[in-house]
Every structure is written in C-alpha cells, then in structure tokens.
Amino acid sequence: MSASAATGVFVLSLSAIPVTYVFNHLAAQHDSWTIVGAAAVVLLLVALLARVLVKRKPPRDPLFYVYAVFGFTSVVNRIIGLEQDGIIDGFMTHYLREGEPYLNTAYGHMICYWDGSAHYLMYLVMVAAIAWEESYRTIGLYWVGSIIMSIVVFVPGNIVGKYGTRICPAFFLSIPYTCLPVWAGFRIYNQPSENYNYPSKVIQEVQAKDLLRRPFDLILVLCLLLATGFCVFRGLIALDCPAELCRLYTQFQEPYLKDPAAYPKIQMLAYLFYSVPYFVIALYGLVVPGCFWMPDITLIHAGGLAQAQFSHIGASLHARTAYVYRVPEEAKIIFLALNIAYGVLPQLLAYRCIYRPEFFIKTKADEKVE
C-alpha cells in the first residue's frame, strides 16, 4: 500500500459533508425504516469505495476498512455537533429529530464532538500506519478503551433514560457500532507488542527498588487510592445512597448525577465496576515488578477515561442540560479540579508505563519460574 491510500480515506471521509446534506433532504420525505436502510447502504458504499482505493495492493489488515467507515461516521458526528451549535444548518436536522433524538442531549452533543475530533484523528493515524505497514498497537488500544467506554454508557443510556420510550429504528445502527470495535479490539491486542531491548542489569536494578525509592510511582499509588475512593463515592450516589454526604454532594457539587437522561448514572456505575477493579490491579502492578500486562490495560483504561471525563465534564456544564442539573456557579472550580485531576491521572499512568517500562518487563528468571 502507498500513502495515497491513506489520503484517499481522508478524502472519502470528507464526502460525508455533501452526503449528509442530500440524505437529510431525502429523509424528510420517507419513513424511519427507509432512513435506516439508506444509512446502511451509504456505510456499505463507503466500505466498498475504500476497497476500490486499495484494489491494486489491498492491506493485510482488514481493520483498514473499519477505520475508513468509522472515519466517515466521525465526520458525520462532527457535522451533528456543528449543527447542534447552530454553526451550520440543514445537514442532519431531520435525522436528529426523527432518527436519534437522544443525540440532542448534552451528553450526545459531547460524544459527537469527541468522535468527530479525537476518534477521527485516531482513525487517520491508524489508516496511515496500515498504509505504511507500521505498528499502531499503542494508539489502537487507546482507541479501543475510548470507544468501548462510549458504547458502554451511550447505548444503555438511550434505553433506560428519558428517551427510552422514543427508541427509533435508527437505534439498530448501534449494532455494528458496538460489535466492530469489540472485534477490532481483539485483533489489535493480538498484534505483536513492542520489544524493549533493555540490558538485564538495568531491568534488575529498577525492579530491585521498592516503592519508597520510586517517588513518582509512590505519588501515583497515593493518587490511585484517592481516585478509588472518589469512584466508589460517586458510584454510591448513582445507586441512590441515602447518606447525608451523598445528598449534599449531589445538591451542591454535581446535580448532573441526577439527570433523568441516565447517562451520568451509567457513567458512575461504569467507573465503579470498571475503574475501581482497574485501580486495584494497577496498584498491584506498581508494587510488584514484572507485571508485563500493565502497559496494555493502562492504555485501554486511559482511553476510556479520556472519553468519559471529556463527555461528563462537558455535559455537566452544557446549556442543553437543564439548569437544575448543571454544576452551580460557585462549585465550578472544585468540580473542574476534581474531574480534570481524575481524568489526567490515567494519562500520567499510561505515559509512565509506556515510556518507562523497565519495572514491568518480565525477566528471564520470572519466565523460568513460570
């Protein structure tokens, strides 16, 4: 494959601009099932066009076509975000009203922007890596964590939230959106991981240091303990804990946790049942040397938390959230400090694991013991 294939995917994704404009005007004249069928045909055509782009030298990695289609949908989501902000008009108006009305929520707005910016850049990078036959395992795992987190919160939230009674046929488009990332995640994880060529002496010296002699790791451990408590606390709020502290926090700090849209509740439950176990495992990995799996799970978790906190913070402050559920003006500084710190911590841990991995490398002695 050549670099022109990656450029072709980029141009193909931009075709979403005229396609959505035409699609919106045609959709206004047909019923919901016709809209779903037409949308499915469009996505299939995008995949076929991506195949035509690389017909002479097709890629070895079939995920090339998945990223091409998802890149197209990322531009669609960016268009939705711009239309919701009133910057453009007439591109997705009918679809937002009749197809997926839950995208009009503050949370829906934020994930559209995340998908149309962060995910879009990841797709372009991964497509370029495939075209140049380079490894993209690191950014791939980060993307897997990000998109899986959005699926875990967004799809159930559409069903159990206030829009649960307005589920339209377009909801079935979520099926490939859910299945393909899971399949992609397994393929990315099974790609060869990076080989670190550190001298055995260096690895042994690093792994011989206890936690007190690794100040940055010690700070990370303390922060992980605090983050675990924060996760459990907000998880209890999502479970309607009657404690006075939970009530006061919800009333004066994060009233958005009680939003009937259900996205914040599901997000807190995802933190409780996903992040808390991860934090416990990460604490173990920072204390016990040779946990070779730490970089991978840390990347996945960092991607998930980046998407989750971007969406949660944005939706908590967004004008589309009812005033009574928005963060009070006097609480914004504390709210932002807590939530930004909580979102940055996994990124710092991922950076530490990827760029200073000596402590996590399995030594030959460990392999012999196994």
Curated annotation (Swiss-Prot):
Report the locations given in the UniProt record. Lysosome membrane
UniProt keywords, alphabetically: Lysosome, Membrane, Repeat, Transmembrane, Transmembrane helix
An example GO CC term for this entry is: lysosomal membrane
Transmembrane ranges?
3-23, 34-54, 62-82, 110-130, 139-159, 166-186, 218-238, 268-288, 331-351
Recorded topology in the membrane:
Multi-pass membrane protein
A Pfam family it matches: EBP
EXPERA domain spans which residues? 60-185, 216-350
Primary location recorded for the protein, binned into one broad class: membrane
Q: What does this protein do?
A: May function as sterol isomerase.
Family stated for the protein in its record: Belongs to the TM6SF family.
PANTHER family linked to this entry: TRANSMEMBRANE 6 SUPERFAMILY MEMBER 1 (PTHR14568:SF10), TRANSMEMBRANE SUPERFAMILY 6 MEMBER 1/2 (PTHR14568)
Protein name (record): Transmembrane 6 superfamily member 1
This protein's gene is called TM6SF1
